[in-house]
Each structure stands twice: as C-alpha cells, then as structure tokens.
Amino acid sequence: MDLSLSTRTVGDRTVVEVGGEIDVYTAPKLREQLVELVNDGSFHLVVDMEGVDFLDSTGLGVLVGGLKRVRAHEGSLRLVCNQERILKIFRITGLTKVFPIHTSVEEAVAATD
Amino acid sequence: MATVELRFSALPEHVRTARLVAAAVARRAGVDEAVLDEVRLAVGEACTRAVGLHQNAGITTPVKVQLVEEEKQFSIEVGDEAPRSAPGDRAPGSAGGDMDTDEDEMGLAVISGLVDDVEVTAGEHGGQIRMTWPTTPPAAALS
C-alpha cells in the first residue's frame, strides 16, 4: 500500500484527497504536494483524510508544516476525517486544537471561521 | 529468546514491513484486536525513530526488533545502535541537528500516549524502546 494523492479546486479552496499510508517513507510525497500547492498560490487547503489507512507522527509533522506555510500567506488548512483511529492520533498529540477537523469535504469547504 | 526477531537496514521503506510483522505476531500472541492498531502505530514510531537515529549518526548496522510472546503479555523491543553522549541521555539530537529533535519527540509522545507500559533506555552503545501489552488467554480468545 502506497500513498495516493489527488487535488481538485472547489471555489477558492484546494482539496487534497489523500489515500493509503502516511508514514516516514511516504510523508515526503505529501510534503512535496503541499509545498507545491502553496508555491503555486493555493493558500486555502482542505486535506481529505477519509482514504487514509495509517498516519504516524511523520505525517503529523508534514501537516503541521503545511499549516505553517499557508498561515504565512494568511491561508488555512482544514482536515476532513471521521476515522476514530486517525482522530485518536490528533487527540493524544494535542493537535485537535491546532487543526480544524471536519466531517465532510462540503463542510470544510464551506467553513470560514 | 525472542518469539520473532527482525533486523532491517535503517531505511524508511522497511518501517512498514516491521509494522506488518509486529501486528501479525501480536495478533497471534493474543493481543486484543482493538489494540492492534495501537501496536502497529507504536512499533512504527519506534522504528521510525531508530531509522532516524541510525541515519543521523551514519550507522550502517540494522535496526533490531524483537517480538516476545510471554505468559499473559506481549512485548516489543526496538533497538538502535546510535550512541548517546551520556549514559541515560534521552535526547538523541545532541550529535545531530535540532530539526530532527521535534519529530523524534513527537514520535515518543505518540508512543507514551498509546502504550501504558513503555520503557525508554539509552546509553553509549545505543538505545531501546520496550513496549508491553497484555494478552488474552488462548481459551478466551477462541470463544
């Protein structure tokens, strides 16, 4: 199982759909994708994690790095996740306070706070 | 002797293999199904940390994972050979860059958040993370 990435634009948001496993081996690909989007001027990102089977601290580090990058441009990075085992990792690291986590892409795209 | 022992070159692509093997052996040993995700994540974090320590220190020897099935418990020991400056030193960033320290600490934070019984040791010959989970007796596991 590898990492799959696809992006699409919804209004002023860019949705990054992630599938597979985000770990020390695959996380650099996600980092590259986020860096590329920000460099191309996409500052409002929605990362859809519904297809993610595994996430570790390396993946969390990449997401935090992405958040730092978009914030430098007054942008946003929202997550879509309903999977308890993935949410648990955000909770034990305290990152639920850092990332807005939504239950659907529609909700994340509509969010403005 | 370990029930299953795994040695792998300190490369990120092998961490997934270690996770899969550890989860398979843990399941066989009777670790609760609900906890297997945690085992997978914790062993992945420990191996990721060991790979980083070996790479930062330029160590070419493999990372060692021991999966030990005991009565009523299952243990995983992940050992690295990265020397620490002082015995008992838990911060491995001393010889490497500061950049990796954050990720290393996040990995340890995840492990201690997930596993109740965890022991981290380090010395001049390397370090070890030992994690232990209770197992269900086989009779109960079959029912």
Curated annotation (Swiss-Prot), chain A:
Keyword ATP-binding: no
Transmembrane segments: none
Residues found modified as Phosphoserine: S57
GO molecular function terms attached to this record: anti-sigma factor antagonist activity; identical protein binding
Record keywords, A-Z: Phosphoprotein
Cystine pairs: none
Post-translational modification: Phosphorylated by RsbW on a serine residue.
Residue span, STAS domain: 3-112
Annotated Pfam families: STAS
Top-level division of the source organism's lineage: Bacteria
Name of the molecule in the record: Anti-sigma-B factor antagonist
Organism whose genome encodes this protein: Streptomyces coelicolor (strain ATCC BAA-471 / A3(2) / M145)
Gene name tied to this protein: rsbV
